[in-house]
């Protein structure tokens, strides 16, 4: 009697397991997924990551020992974009060579710096839209540096000159043809005067 | 009789929950070089999908397509994925050719979208033996006109959120391997500087703030070091430092502009774009310092923005030849480059076969995914503005 009951239960148990796991192919593996927490990347909604906290300009770079080299003497100066706007130098495609036709502009910038010994210079390097982004950022810097070298050759102390590249992020012309592109491949000179 | 039933049952149960122990027909998720198959010529894995609807079905299709699957009817497919998303996602996968069930799972919690991604990942792993990418993340730049910000999102572009609010120019986000942290460039302090940001706290610190250009941070595969492009010595060169920017070492010293360093997965080499004799080339330099070697990219010109594949075998990069093309080349330099698809700035997924990249469309960039072996592409869900410079979290 007992064994019949046992057999019955066993068969029933097996049948149920069989039905659950086998014939009807119902899934039995349940995977619970973690709920999003604050601080989890891309949780399930917008506010689960805090935005980058603000950085105060002039804050010392961590770790100790690394200085913000070379830029302290350019702080507290007033920028004058207009003074040398006419001397913007243009470059050939994919090149940082200062063309001979552009040299008179470089000379004019050198004169302006020689006649005002307290002034410093910021050179912005720019590219047209056709390059890739990081390549253009490096090329824009190379253009600004080439102009600094040209000024150094004319006797200007390179420590008076700071460079900054904007890659293709700051075009002057938004067109998509050579007439726009050639204007965007440029080095701009921004005269810096000490605050009175 | 009891014993026979038990045996039959255990066989059935075992086969239902068996995993990829039985050889799947197409386990290979790697890119073959010389078999004539691969590099865009591999046929997809054919799968039939049924029972899923709406967003869950879209998610599963998207996730599988960009990992080399394609869809057909149940009579033609090797694999059948059936299931439902009525309240929660559940699915059963079987192999029609080998007549066996491969998995049966139900998912709860998070969102329906996330459950569908989890199922897609389990399907990919069951069939190919490699981990799926459906639950991975990307970082990228969103340009909204004059300014840009760094964003992170699911790999398919959903759940995007800004991690900077600098109202200036940002560039070149790079995930720190295994960490919820990014390097990126920001002009927030009036100069292109490299920052490290802990995404779980929002805390950030400057890593390179030298005069001139500080950009293109690339963390080493173990996260202990970072390569970057600095122009502090008079020309944009490749430098390497500890992860916090200390112990700086200059690796290249050319008058040309180096750009876009990337590491080999063994951490020994750094590949980058430069110029030799007026020609734009890819080179690699030992991360510990030493002579640079050229990586030939025969068949294409003007390479830039390299990214080394997770298995070490390939370098994906942009070739600029009138248009921009995503290409790959054997990292050992022993084969020609292959053009894959129009686009720029590729970043490898951790699966070593899917790439994310940017392509130009109507005057702005959109992000797109490419499965290299099958050449199947899908655009990522658009955020806003122009989305570019993607970096895949590994």
Predicted regions and their residues:
Chain B
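A flexible loop/linker signature enriched in serine peptidases of the S9 family
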Residues: 131, 142-149, 167-168, 185-194, ...
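Residue-level detector of Asp-centered blade-edge/turn motifs that repeat once per structural unit
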Residues: 132-134, 177-178, 221-222, 265-266, ...
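Multi-bladed beta-propeller domains
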Residues: 154-169, 198-215, 241-259, 285-302, ...
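A structural "domain/chain start" motif
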Residues: 23-62
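Amphipathic beta-strand/beta-sheet edge segments enriched in Tyr/Trp
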Residues: 76-122
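Hydrophobic beta-strand positions that form the internal "hydrophobic ladder"
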Residues: 138, 182, 223-227, 267-271, ...
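Bacterial N-terminal signal peptides
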Residues: 10-18
């Amino acid at each position: 009697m007992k064994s019949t009951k046992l057999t019955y239960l066993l068969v029933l148990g097996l049948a149920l397991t069989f039905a659950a796991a086998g014939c009807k192919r119902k899934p039995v593996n349940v995977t619970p997924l973690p709920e999003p927490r604050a601080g989890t990347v891309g949780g399930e909604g917008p506010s689960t990551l805090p935005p980058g906290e603000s950085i105060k300009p002039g804050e010392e770079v961590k770790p100790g020992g690394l200085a913000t080299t070379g830029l302290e003497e350019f702080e507290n100066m007033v920028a004058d974009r207009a003074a040398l706007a006419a001397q913007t130098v243009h470059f050939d495609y994919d090149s940082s060579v200062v063309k001979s036709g552009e040299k008179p502009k470089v000379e004019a910038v050198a004169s302006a710096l020689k006649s005002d010994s307290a002034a410093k210079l910021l050179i912005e390097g720019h590219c047209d839209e056709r390059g890739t982004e990081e390549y253009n950022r490096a090329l824009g810097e190379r253009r600004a540096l080439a102009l600094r070298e040209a000024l150094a050759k004319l006797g200007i102390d390179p420590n008076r000159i700071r460079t900054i590249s904007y890659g293709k992020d700051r075009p002057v012309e938004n067109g998509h043809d050579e007439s726009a592109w050639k204007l965007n491949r440029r080095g701009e000179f921004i005269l810096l005067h000490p605050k009175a | 009789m009891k014993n026979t039933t038990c045996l039959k049952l255990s066989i059935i149960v075992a086969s239902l929950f068996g995993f990829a122990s039985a050889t799947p027909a197409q386990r290979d998720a790697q890119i073959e070089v010389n078999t004539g198959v691969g590099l865009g010529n591999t046929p997809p894995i054919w799968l039939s999908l049924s029972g899923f609807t709406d967003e869950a079905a879209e998610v599963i299709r998207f996730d599988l397509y960009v990992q080399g699957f394609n869809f057909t009817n149940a009579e033609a497919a090797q694999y059948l994925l059936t299931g439902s998303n009525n309240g929660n996602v559940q699915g059963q996968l079987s192999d029609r050719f080998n007549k066996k069930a491969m998995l049966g799972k139900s998912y709860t919690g998070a969102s329906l979208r996330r459950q569908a991604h989890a199922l897609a990942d389990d399907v990919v792993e069951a069939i190919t033996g490699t981990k799926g990418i459906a639950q991975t993340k990307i970082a990228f730049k969103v340009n909204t006109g004059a300014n840009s910000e760094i964003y992170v999102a699911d790999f398919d572009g959903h759940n995007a959120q800004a991690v900077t609010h600098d109202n200036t120019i940002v560039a070149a986000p790079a995930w720190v391997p295994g960490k919820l942290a990014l390097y990126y460039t920001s002009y927030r302090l009036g100069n292109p500087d490299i920052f490290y940001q802990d995404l779980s706290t929002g805390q950030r610190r400057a890593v390179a703030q030298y005069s001139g250009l500080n950009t293109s941070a690339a963390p080493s595969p173990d996260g202990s070091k970072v390569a970057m492009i600095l122009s502090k010595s008079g020309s944009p060169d490749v430098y390497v430092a500890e992860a916090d920017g200390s112990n700086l070492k200059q690796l290249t010293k050319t008058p040309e502009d180096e750009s876009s360093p990337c590491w080999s997965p063994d951490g020994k080499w750094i590949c980058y774009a430069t110029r030799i004799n007026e020609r734009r080339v890819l080179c690699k330099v030992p991360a510990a310092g030493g002579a640079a070697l050229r990586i030939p990219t025969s068949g294409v010109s003007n390479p830039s923005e390299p990214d080394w594949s997770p298995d070490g075998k390939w370098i994906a990069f942009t070739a600029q030849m009138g248009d921009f093309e995503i290409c790959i080349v054997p990292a050992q330099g022993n084969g020609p480059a292959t053009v894959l698809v129009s686009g720029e700035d590729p970043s490898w997924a951790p699966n070593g076969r899917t790439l994310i990249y940017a392509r130009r469309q109507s005057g702005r960039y959109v992000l797109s995914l490419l499965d290299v072996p099958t050449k199947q592409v899908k655009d990522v869900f658009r955020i806003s503005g122009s989305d570019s410079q993607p970096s895949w979290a590994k």
